[in-house]
Amino acid sequence: GVRLVGSEMCIRDSDYTETVRSTEFYGTVFSSSGVRWVRPDTISTYVPDDGITVASHTYDNKGNPVEEPRQLYDTSFLSVKDKYSMFLGGNQPLGVVKNANNPDGPRLLIIRDSYADSLVPFLTPHFSEIHLLDLRYYKLSIADYIAQNGIDQALVLYSVPNFVTDSNLLWIAK
């Protein structure tokens, strides 16, 4: 999937240096399947985060907005079971990735589950901002969000099992 999208955006493997971060990754499907004889997968990173800032946006118990800095790759998660949270620091209702190296680029909204998180670093060179909404946690108007944040393009990206079963996709129409 990532290579197909990359080929459409003129992203070449030679543009990146692969860094293997973990050779002991078992994902959600492994955890829920009961199949235990498969070998673990590898987690690699490809994109340096120079000029890239990541922030998670949530609300405190009084409804006030709270911004928490994050990273494209948070390697502290490599020492816990949920290694996939290394990408963008795990699940969050709203995340914003800003690219200081492309301030005039378009703004992308990704409506997604965590499946999209590993793709985001490959998209960062092409956008000034990437806004990530997880409809399991984000319940405000998406149309208002698009208008308030000058979104130019949108992408819906889910794993297939989540896409076909997620009842929260109804929030797209709000």
Regions found by a protein language model. Name each.
Residues G1-G6, C10-I11:
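Single conserved hydrophobic/aromatic residue that forms the stacking wall/gate
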Residues D15-E18:
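Extended hydrophobic leader/signal-anchor segments used for secretion and membrane insertion
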Residues R21-P106:
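Membrane/wall-proximal cationic-aromatic binding patches
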Residues N101-V160, W171-K174:
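C-terminal soluble interaction/assembly domains
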Residues F163-V164:
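Short glycine-rich, flexible loops that bind phosphorylated cofactors or substrates
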Residues S167-L169:
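Short aromatic-enriched loop/helix-cap "lid" or pocket-rim segments at secondary-structure transitions
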